[in-house]
Amino acid sequence: MEELVKQRQKLMPVRIQLSASFNQTATDFLRKQLGIKNSQIFPAKAPLDLSFVYGIQDVTREDTLLYPKRVPQNSPQVSETRPMLAQIKKQDILLHYPYQSIRPFLRLLQEAAEDETVLSIKITLYRVARNSQVIDALCRAAENGIRVLVLVELRARFDEENNIGWSRRLQRAGCEVIYGSRAFKVHSKLLLITQKSRTGVHYTTQIGTGNYNEKTSLLYTDLSLMTANQAIGAEAEKVFDALCADCLLYT
C-alpha cells in the first residue's frame, strides 16, 4: 500500500482545470505534452483554489457571515455520572449524530480500556480524526494488558497514509492489527467489548453507520447503537472471526 501511495504521484493526468483567461497557446502546449483531450480541459471563472477563504474567515470573523453554531446535545438516555458499560447493560443506547454528541461512545471505549473485567476489545477502523481519542483509548487498553484487535482498512481513499501511520502506532502499543481483504473493503463500523462474567463472558457491542471520528461526527448524519444484547454480541464475534480468517491470508 505504501508503494501504491507513492505511485499515485506519478499517475497519468485525467484532466486539466485552469482559469478561463488562461493563454490558449499554453493550453494547447499542456494538452499535447500531457496527452489530454479537449474534453478533459475544464476552464473555470471561479478561483481554482479556495483555501484562501479560510484566512479571510479568521480575519473577519463576522457572526453575520457565518451560519449559527450548532452544538451536539447530550443524549437523554445517558447519565454523565454512571459508567457506560453499566448503563448499556440496563438498556440499549442509540445516538444520532450530529444532533447528539459522540461523547458517550468515547466514554465507553475509554472506560473499557481501564476496566479489569474487560478481556478484549475488537474494532474496525476506516477513517479516524487527526488527534483521535479512539486510537488513544485502544492503545491505553493494550498497554493495560487487554487484548486489542484492530482491523484497519488501508484502502480508505486518500486516508491510506494516515491509516498506515495509525497502524504502526497501534502495533507499538501492543495491539493486534490486521488489514482489509484484497477481495473487498471493510467499511463496517463495529466494536465488540468482551468482559468476564460469572457465567462466562459478557458482550457489549456498538454498531454504527459513521466513522469513529470525533470531527466528522459533528457534520455527518449517522446512527450509533450500543447494546448488551448477547445475541448481537455473538453475531459480532462471528463477524470478527470471519474477517480475521479472510484478512490474515493477506496480512
Predicted regions and their residues:
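N-terminal localization/anchoring segments of enzymes in phospholipid and broader phosphate metabolism
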Residues: 1-249
